[in-house]
Amino acid sequence: MALNLRINRQIRAPRVRVIGSAGEQLGILSIKEALDLAKEANLDLVEVASNSEPPVCKIMDYGKYRYDVTKKEKDSKKAQHQVRIKEVKLKPNIDDNDFLTKAKQARAFIEKGNKVKVSCMFRGRELAYPEHGYKVIQRMCQGLEDIGFVESEPKLNGRSLICVIAPGTLKTKKK
């Protein structure tokens, strides 16, 4: 948030509505009286609403106000979690141990809150038997259904079969 508020001598209006440091209304005063009140309290006069008539000014510590606003912005950015799509690549004739390793990797991605794109790559004549790829993808989806749900059903896209699994359960998705 850009803090481009007018403070103290930057305020151009001859009369302003003043709000005290505790939030109480002090009324409409001349700019000189308002600045004197702020100076007595060792605080700043900050124009918070310049588009009203007369402009609204508040007596506050501007440095502390700026610090609080930037701190709130940082906290809100920390609270946001960006969902990334991670990919796990499989082959239609994958061995059991290799499959378990890939399933463990996909489980770790989902537990961290990321979506997982499971793709089964076909090479050469493997494309003649896409049902083998569907079986591998279905096995992966069934292994992860306790922590995630199938966001997009398996689709054949060129030489690969693609499916997306998202974190959560199907019940939380529908809400």
UniProtKB/Swiss-Prot annotation:
Keywords: Cytoplasm, Initiation factor, Protein biosynthesis. It is found in: Cytoplasm. Its main location: cytoplasm. GO terms for cellular component: cytosol. Monomer. Belongs to the IF-3 family. This is Translation initiation factor IF-3. It comes from Chlamydia trachomatis serovar D (strain ATCC VR-885 / DSM 19411 / UW-3/Cx). The lineage of its organism: Bacteria, Pseudomonadati, Chlamydiota, Chlamydiia, Chlamydiales.
